[in-house]
Amino acid sequence: VDVLCLDKTGTITEGRMEVSDVISLDGNDHEKALCEMIYALGDNNPTALAVMDRYKKDGFLPEREWSAKTAIHFSSAKKWSLAAFEDKGTYILGAAEFILGDAMTDALREQIKTLSEGGYRVVLFAHSDNMPPEVEGGALPENITPVALVRITDCIRKEAPATLKYFAEQ
């Protein structure tokens, strides 16, 4: 075999996302806010499920306590989701370049690139003290601050290394 082309999702991976790290960018713990955001969204997308599974597995999963004023679900066009809470501000999760735009620093871009090595997907968890503007389809609030990076992996199937080794030897 000279060339082997694979669509990794579901072929060499299980198709099940798993959060490997939540890296604070400001020294604070953001697990409670991240879980409250996922509760408010009520999403069953792979990223949301991976976040909740991480905290269930760690025995941390907090009770839902915050009341969301607004929730905007993830879309592949926007590449982010958000939940706005009374007295807590707005939390946003998604692709850093779509959330921050021109405000994304070179240092953050480099950190995301480094964390992405090895096939990880890295999403930004950000906060704003402001509420999002009320426009159709949803929009981001002003003054967004990156607070954490969430590193996610798609688990490799147990038999994948042996399968790939077989093809390499052919």
Task: Give the ranges of each region predicted by the language model.
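Cytosolic catalytic regions of ATP/NTP-dependent phosphoryl-transfer enzymes
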Residues: D2-P146, I152, K158-Q170
